[in-house]
């Protein structure tokens, strides 16, 4: 007679393939979606690339996706700037003595932020660097064409007068 697991203790058929009673087999039970609590549609569940703990369906996530991305980062890991930016604070001494920590951020363009504290208050400066282009041209400054004074630079003969 077979029990709930399907194991028939009285059956001799396949006795060579059955496990001895002293061995334990483990079945991997995957964690359910943290939003809806369901294990259904396992092919549509994303697992956080960083913590490997958070699991969400692509249709339960805050931003709905069409397919499971190769690398998905959960909201908790996204909120931790050290993990997301994968960089150390710019100045270790200043970071230890200050409640404000500066991180280097990388997006479609390279952005370097430097936060410094002074007695007069906090100053924030940002430098944006565009990636080099094949044919860089000088920056053109728009000129006011409404007045006739600035239409053309003076010629050599006019500047000598």
From Swiss-Prot:
Keyword annotations from UniProtKB, A to Z: Metal-binding, Transcription, Transcription regulation, Zinc, Zinc-finger
* Protein name per UniProt: PHD finger-containing protein 4
Q: What does the UniProt entry report for the null mutant? A: No obvious developmental defects. Plants missing all PHD finger-containing proteins (e.g. PHD1, PAIPP2/PHD2, AIPP2/PHD3, PHD4, PHD5 and PHD6) exhibit an increased expression of flowering genes leading to an early flowering phenotype under long-day conditions as well as growth retardation.
This protein's source sits in the domain of life called Eukaryota
Q: What does this protein do?
A: Together with AIPP3/BDT1, cooperates to form a BAH-PHD bivalent histone reader complex able to read histone H3 lysine 27 trimethylation (H3K27me3) histone marks in order to regulate transcription, especially to prevent early flowering; promotes AIPP3/BDT1 binding to H3K27me3.
Q: Where is the composition biased (Polar residues)?
A: 114-132
User: How is the subunit organization of this protein annotated in UniProt?
Assistant: Interacts directly with AIPP3/BDT1.
Q: Where does Zn(2+) 1 bind?
A: 33, 36, 57, 60
Any idea which positions bind Zn(2+) 2? 48, 51, 74, 77
Spell out the residue ranges making up region: Disordered.
114-161
* A molecular function GO annotation: zinc ion binding
Q: Which residue windows does the record flag with biased composition (Low complexity)?
A: 146-161
**From which residue to which do the PHD-type zinc fingers run?**
30-80
